[in-house]
Amino acid sequence: MANEEKKEKDPTVEVAYYPGCSLHGTAREYDGSVREVARVLDVRLLELRDWNCCGASSAHMTDHRLAVDLAARNLRIAARERKDLLVPCAACFQRLKAAQKAFRDEPDQPGEGLAEVQVIHVSDWLRKPETLARIRGAVKHPLKGLRLVPYYGCLITRPPAVTGSREPEDPKGMDLLIRVLGAEVRRWSFKTECCGGSLTMPRADLTRILVSRIVKAAARAGAQGIVTMCPMCQANLESRQLDLKKQDREHPLLPVFFATELVAACTSETRQVNRWKPHLIDPAEVLSPAGL
């Protein structure tokens, strides 16, 4: 009887999972929340065995072939699993999709069959109607009264020739998800503006300008927080806001959430006091009305 009950509770869907370097380092909370959401949805994540760095900016700015080869190795591992490949990191997603485009466009690239691997960003995974319905049914702590703006950044939807996005300039996936959680989505025009993540170390001055524009636009829209699904964007937006606040005490300060963090918090049975500890900007005041 116990075995039968266990069998009924076992996840019925399995997907390959490529966390990438950031989610094993500075964005561990993103990784943890993706795994929490997968459990809520009865999805088993099978982390790729012996995966490697996608190369991100350092590889494709150095050597095209190196960038393709690094991504290709991960695609080969995924191809052996014969499962869809779920990718949370926007940069990793971009590099895997760019490698697949190279296989299609460049006959000399040795990537037979790798362009057919289904590479799915978490935002596309969670926007499916059936997935949104399951999340809606699992919400225990709705974000009623909370005003948020979705921030997609540069890499999840653009360029569409690489990502395959049908709405590269005005994506809707996170908008739908935020509403399912009970929050209000505020209209704004900075959804896909660059935050300067790749310049955050060599040109912090430019990055601060870009971040300031984004945060001020969110504040003007009436938002109490920004929601993203890119580890570089999240770290950059929060850390540079602290710099800006030191320069100008009147500069707005908005917490930046991973969308999966909010899903995990809203569907959790109990309040986890340490959930927001990794954040540089404390979201406690914003989330307290929802009991989070």
Predicted regions and their residues:
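Iron-sulfur cluster-binding electron-transfer modules in prokaryotic oxidoreductases
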Residues: 2-292
